[in-house]
A protein has these predicted regions:
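A structural signal for multi-pass alpha-helical bundles of membrane permease subunits
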Residues: 5-258
């Protein structure tokens, strides 16, 4: 049985890793080789028939990371740093707020708790594109356009509903007896929450953080519409969209090495 399990895991790992391996190999190709019909899976400088293209390893795509764009004067690392800052801070804020809210819904008697939870979840029903214009007008009045803070607040608000529901499920699974024992020993409610619930909910917080980070990292519409006329807070998805809009075609090696 162990051999069968190992074989199944090996097949699964191979299938899961194949796209990543191919993307890494594409990053070592030239633009012509990336779209050539006759290519080799393993990079090699060996000669191929004259009617085919030569497949050679190159670091041209990697060197493009440090080159500022002629249109914006910014390199890829600028957009990567923006994504890291905005994604990480919005994720931390979402998880912290959601954990506190989920603890309240899980441990206290709140009038209309089910209705409040449904209302929180219902904020996910509305497509984000439906509120781009009103949020843009509001952000202009608050002077939050072209800022990291504006996107952090927005992503935190959008991720909060999913985060609350996820964290409530994890906190519901933590036995109340642990907190009650801590309260009997003289712990305050906050101390019991901090010392008892948080350590046991770390797994749930990590899972919630992954979902929030993925959502913030991949968001495109607000990252573009709230950063018009400035590159200060634009993120990686906006950078990728600009690459795809080039008239010379999509530079697949440059896209792959990111």
């Amino acid at each position: 049985m162990s051999v069968l399990r190992f074989a199944i895991l090996l097949i699964y790992f191979t299938l899961a890793a194949l796209p990543l391996v191919w993307m890494g190999l594409t990053a070592l190709k030239t633009n012509d080789d990336a779209i050539a019909r006759n290519v080799k899976f393993i990079p090699s400088a060996a000669a191929v028939p004259t009617d085919s293209r030569r497949f050679e390893m190159t670091t041209q795509a990697w060197s493009n990371l440090q080159k500022p764009s002629p249109l914006t004067g910014r390199s890829f690392y600028h957009y990567l740093l923006n994504s890291v800052i905005i994604g990480s801070l919005s994720t931390i804020a979402s998880v912290c707020l959601a954990t506190c809210a989920a603890y309240g819904f899980s441990r206290f008697r709140i009038a209309g708790a089910k209705d409040w939870l449904f209302f929180i979840l219902s904020t996910r029903f509305l497509p984000p594109l439906a509120v781009v214009v009103p949020i843009l007008l509001m952000y202009r009045e608050l002077d939050l356009t072209n800022t990291h803070l504006g996107l952090i607040i927005l992503y935190t608000a959008f991720n909060l509903s999913l985060a609350v529901w996820l964290m409530k499920g994890f906190i519901d699974d933590i036995p109340r007896a642990f907190e009650e024992a801590a309260l009997v020993d003289g712990y305050s409610r906050f101390s019991a929450f901090w010392r008892i619930n948080i350590p046991q909910a770390l797994t749930g917080m990590a899972v919630t953080a992954v979902f929030c980070l993925i959502s913030s990292w991949n968001e495109y519409a607000f990252a573009l519409s709230l950063n018009q006329g400035s590159e200060a807070a634009k993120t990686v998805p906006v950078y990728f969209a600009r690459l795809q809009g080039q008239t010379t075609g999509i530079p697949w090696p440059t896209v792959a090495d990111r």
